[in-house]
């Protein structure tokens, strides 16, 4: 079968499409899935180039990708067809999901074995051409839930600033913060993406045309915001600390973020930890199905263009998600 592998850390050029990868055998609580689409995320290029802490846990050669959509083939030893059916995962069912933390096997392969609890059925009415959105949903969706609900604990009346409002995670942080009761959400992004931020329910701050710090200061009369959800971190974390209201929280999404500057100032800072559960995946199904989580896919590329996809990820200005189509 075809799969993406890399045998050393480095740039996008280390990614290779192999055509003779062995088909995996599912463990007892795993499901074998025929993959149709793979969602890509900045974490993928950070693992590939060795900068993520997860890279030290990787055995090379390794695969790439954390999330996917596809069709159930069969279950492992403890998951016969009846048991799969009781979970809504009968053979032939279209599903989406992601690798749980600690499972570093890639998803960019024609067939993968993946934990049954890390999958949820795609609604039957979803057309095939809509599957890229589902392939790109799990990681950003579960990250956003962990950031808003677990780390920031956004609640009624909170004011929220999202750094990176039109990235994959940012497009879900905004509606989830509003869903949690936020009274006002501002989101930074390029001026060209201001309308998209408005559509998501936030007030845009065009960082390429105005000073976001001055704008937040003006909009909050110098009080600052209750919560900062920071998908950028490197250029935004430290200055954000000057715009946190008393008792406020800052949530940087990069897992290697240094929280010391915040804690030294008595500001609550928490890095979200993704929890992969069927309950949370089903919440994403409802949100996407009902239009509450309008995740955008910017590009769909064939598997053979994996290096190009990683180049786009590294550029850092991707709007929405980049998805691989294994049938293209």
Model-derived features: positions:
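C-terminal hydrophobic helical "lid"/dimerization subdomain
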Residues: 1, 281-328
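Glycine-rich beta-strand-centered segment in the early N-terminal region that forms part
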Residues: 22-39, 52-101
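Short, charged beta-turn/beta-strand-edge "cap" motif at the junction between a beta-strand
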Residues: 39-40, 79, 99-111, 192, ...
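NAD(P)H dinucleotide-binding glycine-rich loop of Rossmann-like/cofactor-binding domains
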Residues: 83-84, 94-164
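N-terminal Rossmann-like NAD(P) cofactor-binding module of classical short-chain dehydrogenase/reductase
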Residues: 96, 228-229, 251
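Glycine-rich phosphate-binding loop and adjacent beta-alpha segment
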Residues: 104, 234-294, 325-328
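Mid-domain Rossmann-like dinucleotide-binding core that forms the NAD(H)/NADP(H) cofactor-binding site
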Residues: 134-209
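Short amphipathic alpha-helix with an adjacent loop that forms part of the alpha/beta core around
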Residues: 211-223
């Amino acid at each position: 079968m075809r799969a993406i592998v890399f045998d050393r850390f480095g740039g996008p050029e280390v990614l290779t499409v192999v055509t003779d990868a062995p088909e995996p055998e599912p463990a007892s609580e795993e499901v074998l899935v025929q993959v149709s689409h793979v969602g890509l995320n900045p974490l993928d290029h950070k693992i590939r180039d060795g900068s993520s802490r997860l890279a030290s846990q990787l055995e090379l050669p390794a695969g790439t990708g954390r999330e996917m959509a596809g069709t159930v083939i069969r279950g492992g030893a403890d998951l016969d067809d009846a048991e799969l059916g009781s979970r809504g995962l009968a053979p032939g069912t279209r599903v989406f999901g992601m690798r749980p933390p600690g499972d570093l096997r890639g998803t960019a392969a024609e067939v993968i074995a993946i934990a049954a609890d890390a999958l949820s059925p795609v609604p039957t009415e979803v057309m095939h051409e809509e599957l890229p959105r589902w392939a790109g949903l799990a990681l950003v969706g579960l990250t956003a839930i962990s950031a808003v609900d677990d780390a920031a604990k956004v609640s009624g009346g909170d004011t929220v600033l999202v750094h990176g409002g039109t990235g994959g995670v940012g497009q879900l942080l905004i509606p989830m913060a509003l869903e949690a009761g936020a009274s006002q959400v501002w989101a930074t992004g390029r001026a060209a993406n201001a309308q998209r931020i408005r559509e998501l329910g936030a007030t845009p701050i065009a960082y390429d045309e105005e000073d976001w710090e001055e704008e937040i200061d003006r909009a909050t009369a110098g009080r600052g915001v209750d919560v900062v959800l920071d998908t950028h971190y490197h250029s935004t974390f430290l200055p954000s600390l000057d715009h946190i209201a008393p008792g406020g929280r800052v949530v940087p999404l990069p897992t290697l973020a240094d929280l010391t500057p915040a804690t030294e100032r008595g500001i609550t800072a928490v890095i979200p930890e993704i929890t992969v559960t069927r309950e949370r995946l089903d919440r994403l199904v409802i949100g996407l199905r009902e239009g509450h989580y309008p995740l955008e896919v910017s590009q769909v590329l064939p598997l053979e263009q994996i290096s190009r996809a990683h180049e786009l990820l590294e550029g850092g200005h991707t709007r929405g998600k980049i998805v691989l189509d294994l049938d293209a």
